[in-house]
Amino acid sequence: ITSRGLGDVYKRQASRFGFPVMVNTFGQMGASSPVTIAGCLVQTNAETLAGMVLAWLANKDVNAIYGARPMVTDLRTGGMAGGSGEQSLLTAAAVQLAQYYNFPNSTISGATDSKLPDNQAGYEKAINLTLAVQTGANLITQAAGTQAGLMATSLEAYVIDNEMLGAILSTGKQIEVNEETCSVEAIKKVVEGDGHFLGQSATCLLY
């Protein structure tokens, strides 16, 4: 945690020496930003763009990364409600804003409000991460092992989340369509032959 002025100094110095600068802004709904999803996005977007401009003023060639991280606040406790459906929407919308400007982006995803790697943690993380991946997030941080709204970590969760992330990331891949993957010849052979694909060479090669 740094003072506002010291953070700006770090950003300017990093920019001058050519380090990539990830501009992270954390508007928390109802606390440090408006309580509505749209209002939180407006403010967080403006703050992120301002940070990127500051980096470019220090070095016009620096690689600045759009790192907006709008957050849902649990107004009962003041903590982050990272496992909520609204958090998933905020994350996806922030990624889409970066894409609108054609900026490389980074976001937080995979948070949960559960304090244990249980069923609640599983479905909250899965919803959050799937939306982030499907909307095209370039760099996702805090994606594994975190619990209790990013206030705790779990070694068990790291193992579980690693497996989950592999499955979710595969849903973001484009389907490869070419002569080989369409497998017309293999289909023809199976129809005229054994009636299954288990013995086809393509099954072993492409699995």
Which ranges hold each PLM region?
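Catalytic-core signal marking the mid-to-C-terminal active-site face
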Residues: E156-L206
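Single conserved hydrophobic/aromatic residue that forms the stacking wall/gate
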Residues: I1-Y10, Y207
